[in-house]
Amino acid sequence: MPVLGALLAVAALAYGGAALAGYGTGELSIPGGGATTLLRAAVFATLAVHLGELAGARIAGPGPLPHPWGRGAALLGAAACFGQIAVLAQVSRLDLMAAYSTREGGLLLATANGFALAAAAAGPRRPAWAVAPLALVVVAEAWRAHPEAYTPEYGAALTVVHLTAASLWVGGLLYVLRTLRLRPDGDGRWRMFTRYARLAGWLYAALAATGLCSTLRRLPADVVFSTAYGRVLMAKLLLMAVVSAYALAAHRRLRRHRDPDGAAAPARAELVALAAVVAVSAVLTVVPDPHWLSLR
């Protein structure tokens, strides 16, 4: 029940976040914004589950592994992409074939195809074959997120790194926590958790650097609190502060007490906070470009 409640809260945040953030800004509401945000959050979550599973299996090392979720996640991600195309067709008053021919529709179709190929490759013998189609998903989503006329290639490159690092962090943590329940050996559990914590430190640095560059590039300083984009970004930063606190608490217990069970409690709270970050990140991709209201 707590897990279901957390998922429902995250879904509600994704669905209503864009409208809430845009209240009083004077910006136009986004047609179909709630449904688009919810579906985009599903894309981010399923990408994280699959990429995190591929990385987590290497981090876990020898021993029992949890049941793979990669194929199901990839199929759900493909369905979420097709759902976005349907919403695009409805709000634009286009038929599906016409929606496919638009820039966003074509990139969503490429993303869906990447997920479908990843699902086909996610067999028990060679699961790493899913890496290439998942890379297609990341690149297509990065290009879709940057339709602006000003140097979109720089924004897309930053998003590729940011989305990959975020997916490995969230999905890797989920996989490690699932594996932890199957491993009775305390020392082996500690080594697995330590390997993940080391990787997470590098991923955090990549996220911080790309996030800062993207913010400086996309958000003019004079509209930080007067646009939906600025407000959502501030909310994301606050959530990341919460995530950082939980991550540090887990790392401290691992380092000082070599206690994987004690570290698991703040790590689970970190995962819940990261789920909220995923939802807020999806909202960030839907709200209007803040440059329209900037005086600069």
Model-derived features: positions:
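Polytopic transmembrane helical bundles with strong interfacial aromatic enrichment
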Residues: 1-296
